Amino acid sequence: MVIHGGIDGYSRTVVFLRCSDNNHASTVLSPFTDAVQNHGLPERICSDLGGENVDTWRYMVEQHASTSAVVTGSSTHNEWIERLWRDVFRCVGVLYHDTFRKLEEDNCLDPLNETDMYCLHFVFIPRINSTHLKVLLIHGTTMLCLVRTT
């Protein structure tokens, strides 16, 4: 499972977070364009050099007719998104990581079995998106740890 996210660089507002079962460029573009509909088109975006961002870069260049609409580089230079990832892992990722690890230890989940992985994604991706990540989007990172269940 992969979580993609975006933050408004000015207000530091989380504009999208979505869990999915792949890291394809079209998968990243979908929540980005949803965020554009809700928050407007940004002047520019900053992203790392990952191939999963290619469609989003292309979209921005087409919308602005300029390559200056995309700034790429190391994500370590973007402290706000790094802080978000730390909080997401600390308060959401750890919960599911521990759950999935326990399922493996109890021989209820084989990560090499396609059926097991399909079922895991079918059950957990909607739950992660509709509860944990949705609450974070509504309330921001200050509410994140209130979402955590142990």
Regions found by a protein language model. Give the residues of each.
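RNase H-like DDE/DDD metal-dependent nuclease/strand-transfer catalytic core used by mobile genetic elements
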Residues: 1-137, 144-149
